[in-house]
Design a protein with these regions (language model features):
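Conserved AMP-binding A3 loop
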Residues: 31-33, 169-207
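Conserved AMP-binding/adenylation subdomain of ANL enzymes
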Residues: 193-230, 234-276, 291, 295
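Gly/Ser/Thr-rich phosphate-binding loop
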Residues: 146-147, 247-250, 274-279, 289-354, ...
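Conserved pre-ATP/AMP-binding loop-to-beta segment of ANL
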Residues: 152-173, 180, 216-226
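AMP-binding/adenylate-forming catalytic core of the ANL superfamily
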Residues: 88, 94-95, 105-107, 316, ...
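Structural core segment of the AMP-binding/adenylate-forming
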Residues: 48-49, 79-151
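Conserved beta-loop-beta connector loops within the AMP-binding
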Residues: 366-386, 425-426, 488-492, 527
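Conserved AMP-binding/adenylate-forming core of the ANL superfamily
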Residues: 2, 21-64, 71-72, 89-94
């Protein structure tokens, strides 16, 4: 039987609808036929350079069609691509390339200045391929991506001597804000199974019976998904959304210049008649709503029926605001991580709404206490969210972290990245936050996310970040960094009282620091190490043995 790999599915789709658009960006259109030819050329180049079965390919670029083609070429040749965070400095990039055992590096030419000082210490890299961009030329030590992609081999599609297998890997580097980055190892066959083999319950689409059926379905589907992607492809949310659209015979819509800007997002959605959109929670949804509020009626969004989010909190008030402007839209809020897809999901539309951080527990999911007991619905206990079934193999070259994140309970293996939650009597899961960020103040556990969400409900607060700093008496005390809406100056006492009106009094921040920006990463996530450093620099020395935790 044909293996469940991205390459096998995408080749089937490309053969069925070669002239349709696979990827668009600005005015640029890449057809399925063009994507197929370029990926074959990349696959042939990787093999000629000496890469072997499951050799690793690093893709170090902003959002662009070449990003997807670089991965596709790797999938064709039975190789294992992985992502590189383009915000990293030289030593961070060197660590990641070394830890990932990169043998090929595909990169934006604008990052040549980062790679040049470290490439001499990367003897395992057999080929460097640069994507030329505006104002950036290909360095003399790298090959031009366009030149490589133009060398389309006569024998196609390209398949390596070792073939393709369900066990072929996709590596997703994650976790750089709380320690060194780690690569999550997903087998492609498990990813396909986790995604229901192309099934879509919302549309009543059944699962595929084989990879070859993907092309038949794409040919027979009159209105294919057109998916506008806001977050970086270098993170799992954007990457998997793009891969899903291509596998369904749809079009991936990337924003011009490769970076998120709310007006450009809505421009692209309207221009290409997007049917779906992918964001990362409130950090993307808030500026998107602000753009709609500032420009009522500017964009025709009548084709947009679904917006999906994963990776960050997305509050109820924002969802209702988006629905006011796009009344037909379904807002699908998924609680997932690179290690654990599908921990929970909520759906908000004009007919009904979900509370912030409230989800229906996903299939094959559970909550376990620290001693391995299953948390029963309505018990009031909290524990770590766990996903069973199709889960990653673990972290690449990190058996200790693999053992702690993928434990065995009740005789089966689970993925437990560290998200704490409770489950109510009706089965609704309430997310508390990531355990690694938990603040212990006077013996009480406080999760930053719940305080952040409470602060963001204040009309003067655009965004917020919460951390703990050492306290001689109570262990830690809570500090909030608050990013206000333009033209307002939040009052610290008012904000503290605002939190006390929603949460236990000990969860109210002891100090509120008004900042220009909480400095979220491009994927919408907070760098809690940097936030703690900012709080310590401002208030750490002042927090001695005074004041209580409540």
């Amino acid at each position: 039987m044909t293996a469940w790999t991205y390459a096998n599915i995408w080749e089937s789709v490309a053969a069925a609808i070669p002239d349709e658009a696979a990827i668009v960006q600005g005015d640029r259109v890449v057809s399925f036929a063009a994507m197929e030819a370029q990926a074959d050329a990349l696959a042939a180049h990787y093999l000629k350079a000496g890469l072997g079965q499951q050799s690793k390919i690093a893709v170090y670029a902003t959002n662009c069609p070449e990003f997807i083609v670089a991965y596709y070429g790797g999938f064709k040749a039975g190789l294992a691509p992985f992502n590189v965070n383009y915000r990293y400095g030289p030593e961070e990039v060197r660590y990641l390339l070394d830890n990932g055992d990169a043998e090929a590096v595909v990169f934006d030419a604008e990052f040549a200045s980062i790679l040049d000082p470290i490439r001499g210490r990367m003897p395992g890299v057999k080929t460097w391929i640069a994507i030329a961009g505006a104002g950036h030329i290909v360095p003399d030590w790298a090959e031009d991506f366009d030149a490589v992609a133009a060398r389309v081999p006569a024998k196609r599609p390209v398949v390596a001597p070792w073939g393709r297998h369900n066990e072929d890997l996709l590596l997703i580097f994650t976790g750089g804000t709380t320690g060194m980055p780690k690569a999550v190892m997903w087998q492609q066959g498990d990813l396909m199974a986790k995604g229901g083999y192309g099934a879509n319950p919302l549309l009543g689409t059944p699962p595929l019976g084989s990879p070859e059926e993907a092309g038949e379905r794409a040919r027979a589907t009159p209105i294919k998904p057109r998916s506008v992607i806001a977050p970086p492809l270098m993170h799992a949310t954007g990457l998997i959304a793009a891969f899903t659209a291509i596998g369904a015979g749809g079009t991936v819509i990337l924003l011009p210049h490769g970076k998120f800007e709310p007006d450009l997002f809505w421009d692209a959605a309207a221009k290409w008649r997007a049917t779906r959109a992918t964001i990362v929670g409130q950090p993307f949804a808030q500026p998107l709503l602000e753009a709609l509020e500032a420009n009522p009626g500017k964009w025709d969004l009548s084709s947009l029926f679904m917006m999906g989010s994963s990776g960050a909190m997305w509050n109820r008030e924002n969802k209702l605001g988006l629905i006011r402007h796009i009344p037909q839209i379904q807002l699908m809020d998924s609680y997932s991580s690179s290690e654990a897809f599908g921990m929970g999901i909520s759906n908000t539309n004009a007919q009904g709404e979900s509370a912030t951080a409230a989800f229906a527990l996903g299939p094959d999911c559970a909550i376990f206490t620290e001693d391995g007991r299953r948390v029963e619905a309505g018990s009031g206990e909290s524990g770590r969210l766990a996903v069973g079934g199709f889960i990653p193999l673990g972290y690449y070259k990190d058996p200790a972290k693999t053992a702690s994140t993928f434990p065995t309970y009740e005789g089966k293996r689970w993925s437990m990245p560290g998200d704490w939650a409770t489950v109510e009597a009706d089965g609704t899961v309430r997310i508390l936050g990531r355990g690694s960020q938990c603040i212990n103040t006077g013996g009480e556990k406080v999760f930053p996310e719940e305080v952040e969400e409470a602060l963001k409900r204040h009309p003067h607060v655009r965004d917020a970040a919460v951390t703990g700093v050492p306290d001689a008496r109570f262990g830690e005390r809570i500090v909030a960094l608050v990013e206000p809406h333009p033209g307002v100056a939040p009052d610290e006492a008012e904000l503290r009282d605002h939190v006390k009106g929603q949460l236990a009094t000990y969860k109210s921040p002891r100090h509120v620091m008004v900042v220009e920006s909480v400095a979220r990463a491009p994927n919408g996530k907070l760098d809690y190490k940097a936030i703690k450093d900012r709080a310590l620099a401002a208030f750490g020395a002042a927090f001695g043995e005074t004041e209580g935790a409540a």
